[in-house]
Structures are given as C-alpha cells and as structure tokens.
C-alpha cells in the first residue's frame, strides 16, 4: 500500500511525485492519499486536477483496475465543507477568521473567493453569506470532478486484511472508530506514544503532524509528513502486507 502525505495545494510537487510513483506502483497495490489536498499552497485547484488526472491514468492502464484508490478527509477538507455552511454558524466572522488562520484562504482563492468578501458577507448577515457560499459551490461544481472528489473522501481507511488503518492526523485510542469525530483531522495527541495495537490493526498510518518529521515508523504507528506546504517536500511511503516500510518517494 502506498500512502501519500498532506499536499497542501502544492500541485507541482504532487505532479513530480506522481511521475515517480507511476513507475513504482503496481496494479495489486492500494493507493491512499492521507488528506489535506487543499489549503495553504498557491495551486489548490491544480492539485485537485492532478489528483483526478493521475487517477484516470492509473485506471486506464492495461492489465486491470487498481485494487483501491482512496482519499481521506483532512483538516483542510473538513474546514472547506464547514465554510460552505458558514451561514449557519453562531458567529460566522469568528469561525471564518479561525479557518483563515489555519490556511483555508488558499482554497477560497482557488474557487474564486476571498477572505475580504467573506468578512463583508458575514457582517451583512445570513442572506449575504448564503449567496457567497453559493457562489463558491458553483465555482467548485464548474470544475469537472472537483465536487465529486470532495463527496467521495473518507474519514479513515482500512485494508481488507485488517493490517492497516489510515487516518489524517491521529485518533483517540480510548474511543472506537465511530466515536473519533474531529480526532481524525485535528489529532488527539500522543500518536507517537501509541505502544499497542488499536482496534485489531497492526499499524496506524497518518499523513499530517504539526512537527512535519518526515517519515517516522514505530512498532504500531507510522507518520508520513515532510512539511509539504510549509517549505518541505511531499512524501509517499509504501508498506508491505506485514506493516513494514519497503519504499519511499520524495518530490
């Protein structure tokens, strides 16, 4: 299984990584994007286009379809979905500023919006906000495949044999998968301190860590995050059926 770290709108790095990955990945392997395709970088829309293009290229290869290509919901995708419903927030200006402080502005700009427009709409009230978010939705729908991709992202992904659980930022080991909610995209802390299997899975793999440590592999966990979007490279890691790291890529 190949796992791709947070992209954060770095379309050029994603394109370069895909060029390398296309020479390595086999049809009997899974491909998991660990969230945060959106946000921070200056080419969010192009990054989504590259995702869709690479998927089409893989599925068009002779010799059958790939086992699985999965996209996880990261904190950026979660914020974007919440932003599109911001007219229902108790304090939309405060919520918008909170999101802007965490990188959602890049996604706003990718779909024709701006922070300034949002602040003005929030000041005017729910009707103006509804019109503003409606325009953002229309802009996303106008780009073929973008809306469908956002509708298809998963909270977490597991391999059929139960070896792996893939998450965006972490989880709370005291809670079941159904109880995780925001822990998936914001993390619960202590991920690197997990010292026992969770939920019967041999390995937990995440694609975002605020430390951006690169690739860290422990007995029961793995982190894949080189800081793409924050000045670092985009990473991908390949794990075998036993949970061992067997290959890495960087762009």
Give the positions of each predicted feature:
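Feature recognizes metal-dependent phosphohydrolase scaffolds
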Residues: 1-251
